[in-house]
Regions:
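A general structural signal for well-ordered alpha-helical segments in protein cores
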Residues: 16, 20, 48, 52, ...
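Flexible C-terminal active-site loop/helix
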Residues: 227-262
Length: 262
């Protein structure tokens, strides 16, 4: 929770902690098979460590998904990322998951960097939100065997799983979880045609709630599913009526139309 889609960057520190506390209270104490992951990441190593420690003292979190720093992008080299994440992992009381989101940050965690960081026992995985399948395959090849390589891009869920990713952390999973699960099951059971067919249905929705209409698009889709989506924070804008109709069409293509609500 509180990764890119959770608008972490739009929350102040008190709001950030309150959201994590509320989610933890709703989930309850460590349900079997569930990993409670909180998004984290400031522009400095020190800031990120302090953030992780503050949350860990207040809430039981199983792992932190830590986005790359990016403001001083020309200076954020791969070596700088290695030092950054190693220091965070040394200080974190719970495991760390790397988060590579180059579309938003302009910073990519290269396969060789992921491999180097996978040597740290407290760094347990990476969420790769790019659609670079060659890079994903190379990462899987280079990291340690028990290192979790996850896709964060719903438009390539089938392809990423087929390439060897062990799962995904997906915005589209908030509104089409059953389809995502069925793609996972189809890939793991060798039903490649079924997985491909399901992906064809999922991709337009995955695009609609991310790159096309952004976080506002996802919130609109949540409302259509009967949840409270709410508004995005300025300067982000709410989707237009035309955009909402497109989102509804994409949503209905993944499930019976009667499940989508106005």
């Amino acid at each position: 929770m509180l990764g890119s889609t959770g608008e972490r960057v739009h929350l102040d520190e008190n709001e950030y902690l309150k959201v994590i506390e509320a989610a933890r209270a709703e989930v309850g104490p460590r349900p079997e098979g569930l990993t409670f992951i909180a998004g984290a990441g400031q522009q400095s190593t020190r800031g990120t460590i302090n953030e992780i420690k503050r949350v860990s003292e207040a809430v039981t979190v199983d792992a932190f998904l830590v986005i790359t720093p990016h403001f001083y992008r020309p200076s954020i080299t791969q070596q700088a990322l290695i030092a950054h994440y190693q220091s965070i992992a040394d200080a974190s009381p719970v495991p760390v998951i790397l988060y590579s989101m180059p579309a938003l940050t302009g910073i990519k965690i290269e396969p060789e960097t992921a491999a180097r960081l996978s040597e740290h026992e407290n760094i347990v995985g990476i969420k790769d939100s790019s659609a670079d399948l060659d890079g994903l395959r190379e990462t899987i090849k280079l990291v340690r065997k028990d290192f979790a390589v996850l896709t964060g891009n719903g438009t390539v869920l089938n392809q990423a799983l087929s390439a060897g990713a062990c799962g995904g952390i997906l915005a589209v999973g908030c509104v089409a979880p059953a389809v995502c699960i069925e793609i996972f099951r189809a890939v793991t059971s060798g039903e490649s045609e079924r997985a491909s067919s399901l992906q064809t249905k999922l991709t337009p929705l995955a695009q609609a709630v991310t790159t096309r209409f952004g976080i506002g698009g996802l919130k609109a889709a949540l409302e259509m599913k009967g949840y409270v989506g709410g508004s995005v924070r300025a300067p982000l804008a709410q989707p237009s009526d035309e955009a909402r109709e497109e989102i509804r069409f994409c949503l209905n293509a993944t499930q019976p139309a009667e499940q989508a609500k106005a």
